[in-house]
Structures are given as structure tokens and as C-alpha cells.
Design a protein with these regions (language model features):
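Catalytic cores of Mg2+-dependent Asp-rich isoprenoid enzymes
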Residues: 1-73, 80, 84-222
Length: 222
């Protein structure tokens, strides 16, 4: 791993974006647009996916675009799961009219649930893109990334299947559920281990529209 880190082509701008996103979390936040949401998800998690793609010595740069999307999808899951907890800290990442103060009252359940559903649906788009990039990674890395992704995605899917009961607190995927998801994923993980590296070029699989709101941020598809 240390050797991989030494040979990875890190861009200091990526680190700066990550630090900027983390520092921004120290104060109150009231997002009002989808662009703000996606740029934040990129800053605190998409950059992590990008860095990991480089550390794993991805076979093609195309992998970076998908890695950003997977990191962003996981952050969207975090946001959906923690909407009440964040509101209690004065933070509102979901772009909607109710403020963090109004969210804390739990009186606008239907409106908040509707916006929460939109964020979960958005995360599914980015999960799909993220998982499409797995075959650009070295074979032995693919199952770990896949399992991590499906376990995280299960949180937002469970939140949705339970009726978007955000006001009841964090949705948790328990040990039995996680074990079942892992067992069920094993055939696909085996396929990932033997699947050849994708030979598509940089414009082949990734949808550039997914990075439209990221406005030339480091590593994005522009």
C-alpha cells in the first residue's frame, strides 16, 4: 500500500478541495440548490474516491470519474441518513425550503420526506455510475469496493423502504442484514475477480452530465 501511495499521481488541488469541504462542516450550513449539494458531496467524499482510485493504481483515468461518483453517492446516503442529526447541529444539506430549525421541530414531515426521497433517488444514479467503474480497478481490489458500496447503499434503500421515517433518527443496517448482503454478493464478486479491465476510452462509459455541477473541479469529467 505504501508503494502504491508513493507512485500515485496525487494532485494537491484534490487535497485542498477535501480540506475545504471538511472545514466548511465546522459551521452552520443551509443548502438551497442541488449544485451546492453535489459540490459538497464531491468535496468531502468524491475527492476520497478519487484519491483511492489513484492509490489502487487504476488501469485507466476513466476510473477516476466513476470513483468520484461512488464517493459522492455514499455521502448522499450519509446526508439522507443524518438529516435530523445534522439539523440539530445547524446543518441542512438537502436543498429544500424548510430550514434546519424547522427540520428539528419534525412538523414538516411530508415535505421533508419528499425532498429526502429525491436525494436517495439521486444517490442511486451516482451509485450506478460508481459501480460501473469497478472493472477499471485491479482485480483484487474490486470485491472490497463493491461490498463497501452495497452495504452503504443499503442504508438509504432501507430508509426508503421504511417509509422515509427520518424523524425517528438514524436508519441502521444490522449485522444479519449485512451478512446476507455480503453472502448474496459473492457470485458477483467472483465475476469481478476474473473480469478483464474495461477497454472503453475516456468517453465510453461515464456520463459527463453527472459532473455538470462540478464546474472543472479536480479530476472531474468535463
Amino acid at each position: 500500500m505504501l508503494a502504491a501511495i508513493k507512485t500515485a499521481d496525487f494532485d494537491t488541488d484534490i487535497i485542498q478541495e477535501l480540506l475545504s469541504g471538511l472545514i466548511g462542516d465546522l459551521g452552520k450550513t443551509e443548502f438551497v440548490s442541488r449544485s451546492q449539494l453535489l459540490r459538497y458531496a464531491y468535496a468531502v467524499a468524491g475527492t476520497v474516491g478519487l484519491l483511492m482510485s489513484k492509490i489502487m493504481l487504476r488501469q485507466k483515468k476513466e476510473a477516476d470519474f466513476h470513483a468520484i461518483d461512488l464517493g459522492s453517492a455514499m455521502q448522499l446516503t450519509n446526508i439522507a441518513r443524518d438529516v435530523l442529526e445534522d439539523a440539530e447541529l445547524g446543518r441542512k444539506y438537502i436543498p429544500m425550503h424548510p430550514s434546519s430549525e424547522e427540520i428539528k421541530t419534525k412538523k414538516l414531515n411530508n415535505e421533508i420526506s419528499q425532498n429526502l426521497d429525491e436525494v436517495i433517488n439521486l444517490s442511486e444514479i451516482y451509485y450506478q455510475s460508481g459501480l460501473e467503474g469497478l472493472t477499471y480497478l485491479p482485480r483484487k481490489m474490486r470485491p472490497c469496493v463493491y461490498i463497501m458500496a452495497i452495504l452503504y447503499r443499503a442504508i438509504s434503500r432501507k430508509l426508503k423502504s421504511n417509509g422515509l421515517n427520518w424523524h425517528l433518527g438514524r436508519t441502521v443496517v444490522g449485522p444479519i442484514e449485512k451478512t446476507w448482503l455480503i453472502v448474496r454478493s459473492l457470485p458477483f464478486c467472483l465475476w469481478l475477480m476474473v473480469s478483464p479491465v474495461s477497454k472503453l476510452n475516456a468517453s465510453g462509459t461515464h456520463q459527463i452530465k453527472l459532473h455538470r455541477d462540478l464546474n472543472n473541479l479536480p479530476g472531474t469529467h468535463q
